[in-house]
Design a protein with these regions (language model features):
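Outer-membrane beta-barrel transmembrane domain signature
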Residues: 105-107, 111-133, 189-191, 217-219, ...
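Transmembrane beta-barrel strands of outer-membrane/channel proteins
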Residues: 18-24, 49-57, 62-65, 98-104, ...
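Gram-negative/organellar outer-membrane beta-barrel architecture
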Residues: 1-131, 136, 231-235, 294-298, ...
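C-terminal outer-membrane beta-barrel translocator/porin domains of Gram-negative envelope proteins
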Residues: 125, 135-250, 255
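Sequence/structural signature of outer-membrane beta-barrel proteins
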Residues: 3-7, 21-27, 54-58, 105-107, ...
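Outer-membrane beta-barrel channels and translocator barrels
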Residues: 5-7, 41-43, 89-93, 144, ...
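Hydrophobic, lipid-facing positions within transmembrane beta-strands of outer-membrane proteins
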Residues: 30-34, 78-84, 133-137, 141, ...
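Short glycine/threonine-rich loop-to-helix capping motif typified by GTGT followed
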Residues: 171, 269-273, 311
Length: 319
């Protein structure tokens, strides 16, 4: 479920959002997320929460862009995530702050161990459990007219997340995330929107656990790389760019459609070099659930390289 909270219609406080659900899939996965962005003190501060529990048997395909879909490897694991940050307003629409992150994986195992050839998971370093504990530092600027379904504005975020042994982490390592989104009416007189998204995820130092490496569909909303299954590509650095053309089909906005394309690249695990990229594209349907918050259901079908394809469903816009 998604809840959007704004105290009064003319209230200057930005809308807060809370997303919580629990689901059980046909692949015996249990997914329990709680995510929220709460604005405090007349927009002078914001509290960002991202808590999750996953029991998540899922497929990985190896490391780098040259991984083969035929070499799928089923991993089973349980995952507890606790990320909590508070940001303070520096200027209109600009916030900076920090917080704490905990990522704990346990009961990590291959469904079919000791197969030949040896999997990239085993080569990288098999670990049955990992603990990553550290600090987070954020700088963001958000001029979107609506954080759930923007018609105009931009969003930019820089996030640095060092994991530190003195906070209980198994090892010292560091990640950097750079994100930008933009929304523009096109044509200017229409209600159609061009939406752009850049999501980039880098390992700055150290050696993250295998399941904490940048990977397709493992962004905060599990949405990067439509056209490819989650976990299709994985390595130490990731570049992802996406574009959508959002078309209103009915005057009241109940129905809409989307044409989308994306391009992502992952560095080679040993050289850190980007050598190739994976394009994908597709189209989708939008069904409006709430005209005030603009919440909708997104149902997309995407195609990627090497025969990759599938449906992708989301509550709210993809980005």
């Amino acid at each position: 479920n998604m809840v959007v909270y704004k105290r009064r219609k003319k209230d200057s406080i930005l809308p807060s959002t809370v997303i919580a659900s629990i689901s059980y899939t046909q692949k015996s996965q249990i997914i329990f997320p709680f995510q929220s962005v709460i604005y405090l003190r007349h927009n002078r501060a914001m509290l960002i929460s991202d808590w999750r529990f996953l029991k998540y048997p899922s497929i990985t395909y190896g490391l780098g862009m040259h991984s083969n879909p035929a070499n799928e490897n089923l991993l089973d694991f349980q995952y507890l995530k606790f990320h909590e940050s508070i940001l303070f307003q520096l200027a209109p629409n600009v916030y900076a702050g920090g917080g704490y992150s905990l990522d704990y994986f346990w009961k990590v195992r291959e469904a079919f161990p000791h197969v030949t050839p040896v999997t990239d998971f085993e080569k990288y370093g098999y670990m049955g459990h990992t603990l990553s504990s550290g600090l987070m530092f954020h700088l963001l600027r958000d001029t979107r007219d609506n954080p759930i379904n923007a018609y105009s504005g931009t969003f930019a975020n820089i996030s640095i997340n060092p994991r530190l042994k003195f906070l209980g982490s198994d090892a010292n390592w560091n990640t950097l995330r750079l994100e930008w989104r933009g929304y523009f009416r096109f044509p200017a007189s229409s209600s159609n929107i061009v939406a752009l998204w850049s999501y980039n995820w880098f390992t700055l130092g150290g050696r993250p656990p295998y399941l904490m490496l940048p990977s397709t569909g493992w962004d905060k909303s599990y949405n990067t790389g439509r056209g490819y299954i989650q976990g299709r590509f994985r390595s130490n650095n990731m570049l992802d760019g996406e574009a959508e053309y959002r078309i209103r089909l009915t005057k009241n906005g109940l129905l809409g459609m989307v044409l989308f394309g994306n391009l992502e690249s992952f560095s080679e695990i040993n050289t850190y070099r980007f050598e190739s990229a994976a394009p994908a594209g597709g189209l989708g349907l939008r069904i409006k659930l709430n005209k005030y918050s603009r919440t909708n259901i997104s149902i997309d079908y995407g195609w990627g390289r090497q025969g990759s394809r599938g449906f992708f469903v989301n509550l709210g816009e993809i980005f």
